[in-house]
Amino acid sequence: MKIAAIQKLSLIDYPGMISSVIFTQGCNFLCGYCHNPSLVLPQSFGDFVLEADVFDFLKTRIGKIEGVVITGGEPTIQLDLVRLIKKIKALGLSVKLDTNGSNPGMLKKIIDNKLIDFIAMDLKAPLNKYSAICGVNVDIEKIKQSIFYIKNSDIEKQFRITAIKGIHSVEDLDSIKGIIGDNITLQNFKFSGKHIGNSFSKENEFSSKEMDEFRTA
């Protein structure tokens, strides 16, 4: 398993649970606004974290954390993701999976076999703008399939989008709501200076007032 890092404690990544976060290495999207180039760009990859070391740590946290978040990068491109999830569940911990929805076959397998407890899918844009935002040619049918599987699953779920000023509009959000419904978690873009693309700045952040207007539009 290609594990780039582990965050030992998080109070926000798994809603309602104290968790640890496993970051997988590698992604099949190249979203310019991504703030984790070290997880996406091969030339920025660091050394892997040994899976054995991750589980040695998790065993010391039993009774102190309630769950583990598997994020990326994009976890579903990892061929041994199912095995990793099963090992975490064997410790009695809940599992939340973050995904970009590009691998519906893997998601269906995971959902149908009830391997995870929570799934969060990051939506990038209206479907007609997906490839432009993601920096690669995206198979939109796969995105639609993933949305369908997640929406119709009986596990906890979250659809979220990072709103970027100058890129996303109220009309874009309305288009996404037409597919998902109103239950979307809207996150504001935050400029870090460490994005995959070099065309982003503080100007791409919405103000608090603008975000409130965006949410209620």
Residue ranges and their predicted role:
Residues 1-17:
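Short, charged low-complexity linear segments at domain edges
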Residues 37-68:
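Conserved alpha-helical substructure of the radical SAM core
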Residues 6, 187-189, 216-217:
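Conserved beta-strand termini and adjacent loop/short-helix elements that scaffold enzyme active sites
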Residues 23, 71-72:
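A secondary-structure boundary/capping signal
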Residues 44-47, 73-74, 97:
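Short, flexible loop segments at the rims of nucleotide/cofactor-binding pockets, characterized by
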Residues 55-67, 76-203:
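Conserved AdoMet/S-adenosylmethionine-binding subsite of the radical SAM
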Residues 202-217:
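Charged phosphate-binding loop/patch that engages nucleotide di/tri-phosphates or the phosphate backbone
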Residues 14-49:
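Canonical Radical SAM [4Fe-4S] cluster-binding loop centered on the CxxxCxxC motif
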